[in-house]
Amino acid sequence: MRWPPWASNTQASNNDHPTTTNNNDPKNLLDWSAFTELRTLIPTLVLTTGILSAFTLHRNYLRRFPTAVNITPAYYRRRSILGKVTSVGDGDNFRIYHTPGGRLAGWGWVPWKKVPTTRKELRDQTIHVRIAGVDAPEQAHFGRPAQPFGKEAHEWLTGYLINRRVRIYVHRQDQYQRVVATVFVRRALDFPVPFRRRDVGYEMLRKGLATVYEAKVGAEFGGEVMEKKYRSAEWWAKARGLGLWKGFKKNRDAWESPREFKTRTGMEDVGDGKK
């Protein structure tokens, strides 16, 4: 039926067939307005924030570094790493198993967070640490003779650190895939203050078990303040003839520092490479 008179055939045809809706259109299948309601928005925001916070927490504080090369530069001179000492290679280097978060994160008491004990389990899973700012006498390596007090320095460091938790402040990585770091440890039987935090490098210098690191390149102390502190500790031991300085007082001409000994024997400062 054509009404009004001026209406076209096309218009009349369109009016005779009502408009249909495409039920296959996703826009018609979902009620998008539901996503803007507070009862939906708030739980979604809380869940998203929680997931992002957990990811950030794990990435910044709970991520475990298997070896020194895995440590990101963001840690250098800014962050510390907590770990358990698994072996002592020489008088100034050792290896730790990184335990991020420590006991609060379950290390030592949660069944699946235990430090391995066998060499096979520890292989490629420990961080090789070179104590910053100190140079200990060398042990016998690769057929070369040991330096006086090399054995004593190694035995002292082993007894002081092995199987203990230490905190290392990483300064950089060296050419031997080790991290050069200032090392701190707490010991229950530390007289006169139990659990006092001790600077391991400083303690070695005070006891005459090491000298200040004297290489022309690569020396790292963690700042001028630490360097002055270490040189003062060395002076203390030297003035009293402690440890390796006994030989210095007896015969200065024949005495060799760890650096001079390495130069004379051609011994590289690489430790023993134990895992």
From Swiss-Prot:
Gene Ontology annotations for the cellular component aspect, listed alphabetically: membrane; mitochondrion
Signal peptide extent: none
Keyword check for Transmembrane helix: yes
Documented EC number(s): 3.1.-.-
Catalytic site positions: R130, E138, R178
Compositionally biased residues, Low complexity: 14-25
Domain annotation TNase-like: ranges: 79-247
Recorded topology in the membrane: Single-pass membrane protein
Subcellular compartments: Mitochondrion; Membrane
SUPFAM superfamilies: Staphylococcal nuclease
InterPro entries, alphabetized: SNase_OB-fold_sf (IPR035437), Staphylococal_nuclease_OB-fold (IPR016071)
Residues binding Ca(2+): D135
UniProt keyword terms in alphabetical order: Calcium, Endonuclease, Hydrolase, Membrane, Metal-binding, Mitochondrion, Nuclease, Transmembrane, Transmembrane helix
Record GO terms (molecular function): endonuclease activity; metal ion binding
Family to which this protein belongs: Belongs to the LCL3 family.
The protein, known as: Probable endonuclease lcl3
UniProt gene name: lcl3
